[in-house]
């Protein structure tokens, strides 16, 4: 159910009811295709449908990957993020082989970047070396305003339109639109 409508987007936030979805899905036939089937009923109403997944690689994420045309992968510029990225890539390959052979990686988005730290610079360089052109030019910095916006139930563009976070996500949107020819 859409809980927030604006001129440019609709928002369906996760609710507490989603917490039991993994358990419910586990016993259902064709469980990997449930989200795909649900989205088919509304896909013509939207130019893009973005699904923000939890960092876990369970049935909810597999459902999202099965339903998706492409994945935008956010990568925190921190050490353990590289480890998690390897696991994510393995899951993507499994989903491609078993459920969605056309699943594409749209790009890698570097997030929580703090240019004052050597680690952020090193992680950024490693990701760019490995993924090359798949890494978006836009980099999301660490930002207090970005971390505050969700607690007010708002996107950063609505919460603080002049903030660096809003500017960066606007740049990312433009980069993605250019990538997909819109």
Please report, for each region that a protein language model flagged, where it lies by residue.
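Conserved catalytic-core segment of NTP-binding enzymes
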Residues: 40-144
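Conserved beta-strand scaffold positions in the cores of enzyme catalytic domains, especially
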Residues: 11, 135-139, 156
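Short, conserved glycine- and acidic-residue-centered signature motifs
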Residues: 28-31, 81-84, 165
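C-terminal alpha-helix
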Residues: 171-182
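Active-site donor-binding loop signature of nucleotide-sugar glycosyltransferases
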Residues: 14, 138, 142, 161
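C-terminal boundary of histidine-terminating zinc-finger modules
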Residues: 150-171
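P-loop/Walker-type NTP enzyme "switch/lid" segment
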Residues: 1-44, 99, 149-152
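Charged catalytic carboxylate motif
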Residues: 34, 87, 168
């Amino acid at each position: 159910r859409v809980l927030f409508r604006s001129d440019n987007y609709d928002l369906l936030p996760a609710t507490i009811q989603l917490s039991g979805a993994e358990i419910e899905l586990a016993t259902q036939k064709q469980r990997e295709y449930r989200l795909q089937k649900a989205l088919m009923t509304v896909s013509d109403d939207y130019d893009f449908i973005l699904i923000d997944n939890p960092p876990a690689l369970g049935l909810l994420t597999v459902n999202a990957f099965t339903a998706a045309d492409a994945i935008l992968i956010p990568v925190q510029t921190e050490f353990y993020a590289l480890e998690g990225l390897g696991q994510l890539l393995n899951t993507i390959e499994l989903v491609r082989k078993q459920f969605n052979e056309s699943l594409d990686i749209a790009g890698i988005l570097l997030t929580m970047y703090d240019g004052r730290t050597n680690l952020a610079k090193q992680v950024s360089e490693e990701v760019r070396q490995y993924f090359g052109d798949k890494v978006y030019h836009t980099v999301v910095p660490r930002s207090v305003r970005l971390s505050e916006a969700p607690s007010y139930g708002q996107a950063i563009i609505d919460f603080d339109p002049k903030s660096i976070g809003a500017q960066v996500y606007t740049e990312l949107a433009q980069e993605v639109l250019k990538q997909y020819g819109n």
